[in-house]
Amino acid sequence: MEFPEHSRHLLQCLSEQRHQGFLCDCTVLVGDAHFRAHRAVLASCSMYFHLFYKDQLDKKNIVYLNSDIVTAPAFALLLEFMYEGKLQFKDLPIEDVLAAASYLHMYDIVKVCKKKLKEKATTEADSTKKEEDTLSCSDKIECLSDGSSHMAGDLPSDEDDVEEEKINSKTDLATESGNMWIRLSSDSASIPQTGGEVDTHTTAAGKTADSPCSSTGSLSHRSATSMGDSTDVDCVLDLSVKSSLSGTETLNNSYLSSQEILRNSLVQVKIEREASCEDNDIHTSEYDIERNTVKENVSSNIRAPYEPVHLAPIREDSVLRELDHDDKAINDDMITPENERVQMEANIDNSLLPYVQNILSPAGQIFMCPLCNKVFPSPHILQIHLSTHFREQEGIRSKPTNDVHVPTCSLCGKTFSCMYTLKRHERTHSGEKPFTCTQCGKSFQYSHNLSRHAVVHTREKPHACKWCERRFTQSGDLYRHIRKFHCELVNSLSVKSETLGLPAVRDWTLEDSSQELWK
């Protein structure tokens, strides 16, 4: 017989005991915050606590967590999850919970946090894109309203005059920029034409479009015979214009509106100019707009009287300013990570460049030689370089001349490349131990021995077993553990790799491992 609610009831009882402090056998310290809990629950939910209590169960009543990585609110949330099985972020930053879960090896929580961060980033990107689209649309609408404000103020107020003027003729003036349309319907007589006819090119659907980027910048007109088809076209604005409005003023206002639309639309403009062109050629510069628009050419007889000549220099100056801005942006982009990499490699020893080029990354860490201040991309290459400083000649070197001073040991007569290696060598004769531990007072001959000893006091276990995840303070303890518990596994893997032609076990990378393990 099974009791499905047993696990939930057990968690509830454990949570109540934790809040009451009943049977709590450990205390977790995160900075100044104290958390009472049960070892069994902590070890069951976190691999960090499992390994922490595995070795010395009776001597670890207090657990110190790194407050720089794990914050008290984040650990409190994870502790509630351990006892209740519910994860409620509330107002806590997801990044803090992710850092704490990674530190405690709670991989399920890590996956959830990464998923939430990814969704958050996607949502923010979508909202930013919508805001940009909204702003661009509002800018275009403002341009449309500004361009038509002059004509809207001259609308007829007398209905009888409007009815009387509708009988005469009707002319539509269209302006296109991207996907935004303006249609100014004239209910009065068409603009007087001084001669010639208007050349129009219709699309497959029968619609007429203007070219806002013609060589003279003027607008084309639709003929009066297109009055019947104008009602079938969707318009953004449909404004009526009195017959008293002069043709020059109408075209100038329309030209201003079209230029505002062109300035705010996302259209790429290319200017083809010759260095030897005359001043008149500036007004006839060829504009190629990379967009699928229908172009109209207005005959010279019509566009000459209404050419807004005073706007041509303004249009030319604005386009030139944009080109100068693009050139400046290109020059700013010349400083790239690739250039930084070239500058960094320039400081590296030329003899090592063939080895460095395949290793150095644009954001890689660099290592500096303390003797000659040369920079290297990895500690391995730095060690190779240091060997050139510390290399000792075989046997005893010949006695140097009085003009050259070579570091020489006064006891055994050995010569060295620098004073640093000579001082290290002299400690073997004197037994000097200049490096002393501040915790226990133990002394060591070399600094790396002191660093290895300091781990004993910090209780860190940087050496991990690849097979059982046990961690050790010293690398020698890890070697002995592998020989004792995983020797058969290592041998079987070695045989298997030789049979299948796989890389040998001695080629595998272990944390802080040594070839002495396989001797």
From Swiss-Prot:
Residues 201-227 have a biased composition (Polar residues). This is Zinc finger and BTB domain-containing protein 18.3. PANTHER family: ZINC FINGER AND BTB DOMAIN-CONTAINING PROTEIN 18, ZINC FINGER PROTEIN. A zinc finger (C2H2-type) spans 367-389, 407-429, 435-457, 463-486. Pfam families: BTB (PF00651), zf-C2H2 (PF00096), zf-C2H2_4 (PF13894). One of its GO terms (biological process) is regulation of transcription by RNA polymerase II. It comes from the Eukaryota. It is found in: Nucleus. Residues 189-227 are annotated as: Disordered. Transcriptional repressor that plays a role in various developmental processes. Specifically binds the consensus DNA sequence 5'-[AC]ACATCTG[GT][AC]-3' which contains the E box core, and acts by recruiting chromatin remodeling multiprotein complexes. GO terms for molecular function: DNA binding; DNA-binding transcription factor activity, RNA polymerase II-specific; zinc ion binding. It comes from Xenopus laevis.
